[in-house]
Amino acid sequence: MEYFDMRKMSVNLWRNAAGETREICTFPPAKRDFYWRASIASIAANGEFSLFPGMERIVTLLEGGEMFLESTDRFNHTLKPLQPFAFAADQVVKAKLTEGQMSMDFNIMTRLDVCKAKVRIAERTFTTFGSRGGVVFVINGAWQLGDKLLTTDQGACWFDGRHTLRLLQPQGKLLFSEINWLAGHSPDQVQ
C-alpha cells in the first residue's frame, strides 16, 4: 500500500504548457512501459491529450467547469464532474475547457491487451473486490483505510488484496479505481 497527498506530489509540466501532471503510481512501479498508471492532471488551456498506443484512458473530471472532448471521427463528449469516461488513448482527442476555466481530472490508463480499469464514485463505506491493483482518491470527507486516515486530496494505491474504506462522517465522496487482469495475465508474471 502506498499513500499520497496531492498537495505534496511532484508536478511535471507539459511540453505544450497547457497543463501539468501528478503521477500517483504505475505498475510495474517506476517503469515507463507500464501496464497501468494513475495520475491527476490540471488543464489550464485547450489542447490535445498525449497519445498512448495500445492503452485505454478513463478520465474523471474532479474540479472546474465541464470539458468538451472531441475525437475527429469517433466521438464528441461533454465531460461532467465525477462522471468517468473511457476512450482509446491512441486516438487524437482534443479537450476544450468551458468558459476558459482551469480543470483538474483523474486519469487511469491500462494496457488494452493486459488489464482493465473500472472507476466509480463511492459515498459510503465499502470493501474492494480483491483485485490485483487499485487507487482511491478522497474528493471530500474523512475515510479510514486500515490504520490510516485519508482526507480531501489524499489517497492510496495498492497492487494486491481486499481493502475496506470506512466513511467516518455523515457525507463524503471518494473516487475508486480497481484494476482487473485479463485471462492469461497476472501481475505476478511481471514483478
Swiss-Prot record:
Highest taxon above the source species: Bacteria
Pfam families per the record? HutD (PF05962)
The signal peptide here is: none
Q: Which family does it belong to?
A: Belongs to the Ves family.
Q: Mind telling me which NCBIfam families this protein's record contains?
A: PRK11396.1 (NF008488)
The protein depicted here goes by the name Protein Ves
Question: Per the UniProt entry, what species is this protein from, by scientific name?
Answer: Escherichia coli (strain ATCC 8739 / DSM 1576 / NBRC 3972 / NCIMB 8545 / WDCM 00012 / Crooks)
At the highest ranks, the source species' classification is: Bacteria, Pseudomonadati, Pseudomonadota, Gammaproteobacteria, Enterobacterales
Question: By which gene is this protein encoded?
Answer: ves
